[in-house]
Amino acid sequence: PYVLFAWQKLCEKETENISVNGELNTELLRSKLNTIKNLMFEKIDVWTEKLQEIFAECGVAFAIVHNFKGAPVQGFIKKSENGKNILCMTIRNGRADSFWFTLLHEIGHLLNGDLSTRFVDFSSVVSDAEAKADEFAMNSLIPVEQYLKFTRFCDYHNECEIHTFAQSVNV
């Protein structure tokens, strides 16, 4: 749809003046995952600036771009015409859980080498690359072994136990 194309163009415009350190450095990005995850607990003005710095260091121009009504988009990666790697996000519906999952999903695309294809993430897209990025995001937020242990041995309907578990996995 045209609204999606317009949002992508806005992303390109928002990131064109962001300086990055060369090409995408996936090893450095992978090493920054815990730092990125720890930003979940900061105020929005702190983590937006820190994310821009981290991504620029890893060779990616990062921006949070307001979403348009009718554009069911959460995140977007692209290698621009001038060769710059772009990662744009929305804060659609104001939900932190969606934002952080989608951010890690987009990082999964970057680490999986999916930059050769333009990826726009919205709910109707289903593919192997999307499934791999989803799995990466899930395991980055809550390691599967810990999740299975929690659901097997704890009362996952008990709010207190959920909070304790969330603290133990740093989410």
Enumerate the language-model features and the residues they cover.
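Short juxta-domain linker segments that transition from a proline/glycine-rich
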Residues: 1-171
